[in-house]
Each structure stands twice: as C-alpha cells, then as structure tokens.
C-alpha cells in the first residue's frame, strides 16, 4: 500500500492471499499503510531471513504472517527479528488448519508469536490487533479504531432481529 508502511503482511504462498486479504481489508478500512509480500519459509528461506533481519530497518513495527500446513513462517520470522509477529494459521484441506495452528502457537520460550484464530477471522483480527498496537502511539488511529468498534456495535444494535 505505501512506502511508509509500519505493518508488513506476509504469507507463505500466493494461495494464502484468500485468507490474508482479510487483514489488509481491515487495514484499508482503518487507513493504515502496509506492505504485502509472499515469503515462503520452505521455498525461499534466504528471502525469509533477509526480510526478517531487515524488518526494523524497513520501518515495520508489526508483522502479520500467515501460513498453512507446516506453518513455520511466523515462527522463523520471530526467530530472526525483534519486531512483534502476529501469526495467522491458514485453513488447510487436510487438517482444517489445526496443523497450522499447532505449528504457529507452540513456540519455544523466548521466541513469542502472537497467534490468532484459524482462517479469515484470525486474519481480520490480526489486522485489528496490529492497528491497536500502533494506535498506542497514534491518536488519530486510536480514534479510527474507536469509530470502527462503535460501528460494529451499532450494526448489531440496529438489527436485533435475525430474521431481517
């Protein structure tokens, strides 16, 4: 989205975009610039190391990393940078994303990855959480997040009858 991106949204393969675009849609709605890139832990390990080692220098304050199957991307990025990493397990056809969840959530002590839910809801929440992290130092973003939440609440309150 922008060269001034403070959030990077990376994924293990192009097929993960269907899930990870949920994070970028939230960031777009909140007017938060981000960078998007495919970085495969298994197919492009050198690229992964370069991305992670340069994350802070490139201005990223939060990294959202989504992967499916043997989902090593979030953990490997976290191992190579001190920039906070939010991991999104992408639903897989074989084990419905449970394999991805376990790969991301079971990190060893000392290398944290903030793990979200499996699939699109997890990606959307990763976008929200990344924005909330940045909002601690950005009053305008904080205000936009308040409006987002208020809008969510009003959508429920304004439509209480599930039949309509």
Curated annotation (Swiss-Prot):
Enzyme Commission number(s) of this protein: 5.4.99.18
Protein name per UniProt: N5-carboxyaminoimidazole ribonucleotide mutase
Catalytic activity: 5-carboxyamino-1-(5-phospho-D-ribosyl)imidazole + H(+) = 5-amino-1-(5-phospho-D-ribosyl)imidazole-4-carboxylate
Stored SUPFAM superfamilies: N5-CAIR mutase (phosphoribosylaminoimidazole carboxylase, PurE)
Source taxon at top rank: Bacteria
Binding positions for substrate per the UniProt entry: 13, 16, 43
InterPro entries tied to this protein: PurE_ClassI (IPR033747), PurE_dom (IPR000031), PurE_prokaryotes (IPR024694)
Function: Catalyzes the conversion of N5-carboxyaminoimidazole ribonucleotide (N5-CAIR) to 4-carboxy-5-aminoimidazole ribonucleotide (CAIR).
Entry similarity comment: Belongs to the AIR carboxylase family. Class I subfamily.
BP-aspect Gene Ontology terms: 'de novo' IMP biosynthetic process
Taxonomic lineage of the native organism: Bacteria, Pseudomonadati, Pseudomonadota, Gammaproteobacteria, Pasteurellales
Source organism of this protein record: Haemophilus influenzae (strain ATCC 51907 / DSM 11121 / KW20 / Rd)
Keywords: Isomerase, Purine biosynthesis
Pathway(s) it belongs to: Purine metabolism; IMP biosynthesis via de novo pathway; 5-amino-1-(5-phospho-D-ribosyl)imidazole-4-carboxylate from 5-amino-1-(5-phospho-D-ribosyl)imidazole (N5-CAIR route): step 2/2
């Amino acid at each position: 989205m922008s060269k001034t991106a403070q959030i990077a949204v990376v994924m293990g393969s192009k097929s993960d975009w269907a899930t990870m675009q949920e994070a970028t849609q939230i960031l777009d709605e909140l007017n938060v610039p981000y960078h998007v890139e495919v970085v495969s832990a298994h197919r492009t390990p050198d690229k992964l190391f370069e991305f992670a080692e340069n994350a802070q220098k490139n201005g990223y304050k939060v990294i959202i990393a989504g992967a499916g199957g043997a989902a090593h991307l979030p953990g490997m990025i976290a191992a190579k940078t001190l920039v906070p990493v939010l991991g999104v397990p992408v639903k897989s056809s074989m084990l419905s994303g449970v394999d991805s969840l376990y790969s991301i959530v079971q990190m060893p002590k000392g290398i944290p990855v903030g793990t979200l839910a499996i699939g699109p809801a997890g990606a959307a929440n990763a976008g929200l959480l990344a924005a909330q992290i940045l909002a601690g130092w950005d009053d305008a973003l904080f205000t936009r997040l308040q409006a987002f939440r208020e809008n969510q609440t009003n959508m429920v309150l304004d439509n209480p009858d599930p039949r309509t």
